[in-house]
Amino acid sequence: MKIELSVQPWDPGYSSEGATAQETYTCPKMIEIEQAEAQLSELDLLASMFPGENELIVNDQLAVAELKDCIEKKTMEGRSSKVYFTINMNLDVSEEKMAMFSLACILPFKYPAVLPEITVRSALLSRSQQTQLNTDLTAFLQKHCHGDVCILNATEWVREHASGYVSRDTSSSPTTGNTVQSVDLIFTRLWIYSHHIYNKCKRKNILEWAKELSLSGFSMPGKPGVVCVEGPQSACEEFWSRLRKLNWKRILIRHQEDIPFDGTNDEMERQRKFSIFEEKVFIVNGARGNHMDFGQLYQFLNTKGCGDVFQMFFGVEGQ
């Protein structure tokens, strides 16, 4: 929304009969709302363009809920999280083979005035190939899409150019399962937020299901409750499917990480932040048992290299 102002230059000898100079002033608040509306519209468009299961994964559902709420209230106050989603595309890399390419997309608050943060990954790409692909994609977006929504442009660019970054040796190597197997070549880490976790049966289920599915991570009972599981994508999806069917006041995936890997056990173990799955209880001295010490939680996450997740969960920086 632009507000046109007619301004007459101040001059003692200036006559009002003369021409007026015009300035254009854009209200910062309206710019923020328009940017938020553009983000939501693009997300709706992407949902229609990628309707298949696991084609479009909203990694941070709460961020989208915050975005919608801010648009409805016409204010960006209270918005704490960036919209974060992943687009998975199965692309032809040779005449005989398809491979999954994942675009992890984070939309800054000022997007589309600034470029999105996009990282393309595939199990077929070496580290240097992946770096070069992402560098070239960023250069393309800077040249052609600055100031406009551009996620679809990014997907089309990857669709057209991805095969050129896969080495001939890699693309010609034998494989089995193609698309079906590619799902299991994703290492997933789910960060689950619950209004509270008190019930002993639920806590027991969480521990038993994680063990059954060979997932590592932790659960923190109390109010709020936190659960993190990591392992093969299919196992994490099964865990979430079981968990969400229980009776909860509120539960959601607050953050999701999807990391392509080569499918070997050694590589999977290297991706893990946690060696086992355990229940962690961080009790505040002198407080009721259902209130946890978030300072201890933050320190625990920091030791695991996950300190940045704290702000995603609670909207404040950990201490």
UniProtKB/Swiss-Prot annotation:
Matching entries from Pfam families are given as: Prp3_C, RWD
Answer yes or no on keyword Phosphoprotein.
yes
Q: Which SUPFAM superfamilies match?
A: UBC-like
Question: In which domain of life is the source organism classified?
Answer: Eukaryota
Indicate yes or no for the key word Phosphoprotein: yes
Q: Which residues carry this modification: Phosphoserine?
A: S275
Keywords noted in UniProt: Phosphoprotein
Stretches assigned to the RWD domain: 41-165
Q: What is this protein called?
A: RWD domain-containing protein 2B
